[in-house]
């Protein structure tokens, strides 16, 4: 079985990590997920893939994985709601230093903060996301 794995390196046009030639904002993601949904893809996590590989689980007929590697707050506030509207979840890989180090003295106002906080990360997990 072939499983497409998408990797999103930066999702915010204002973020230094996002490639400037093709920013992946909420509108582009909506179109992207609409196409995947129209083609019949169903999202899976690495845990589901591992369970299938070990013979302990099944995969949907057309699995797809959506990976994100920067825990920016727009993943929770913009991208996850779009994904959820199509029944999708993602795999988020977190570099914890920004969460633990940057905000050690307290959280800045929401409009100044760029990274996820633990509460938002837990909420993504409750939505079915894999956090790695």
List PLM regions with ranges:
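Catalytic alpha-helical scaffold of carbohydrate-active enzymes acting on polysaccharides/glycoconjugates
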Residues: 1-132
């Amino acid at each position: 079985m072939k499983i497409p794995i998408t990797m999103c390196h930066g999702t915010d046009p204002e973020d230094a990590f996002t490639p400037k030639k093709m920013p992946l904002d909420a509108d582009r993601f909506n179109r992207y997920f609409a196409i995947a949904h129209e083609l019949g893809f169903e999202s899976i996590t690495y845990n589901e893939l591992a369970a299938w590989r070990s013979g302990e689980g099944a995969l949907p007929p057309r699995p797809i994985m959506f990976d994100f590697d920067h825990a920016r707050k727009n993943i929770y506030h913009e991208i996850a709601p779009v994904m959820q509207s199509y029944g999708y979840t993602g795999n988020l890989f977190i570099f914890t230093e920004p969460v633990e180090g940057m905000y050690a003295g307290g959280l800045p106002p929401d409009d100044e903060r760029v990274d996820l906080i633990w509460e938002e990360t837990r909420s993504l997990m409750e939505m079915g996301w894999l956090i790695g």
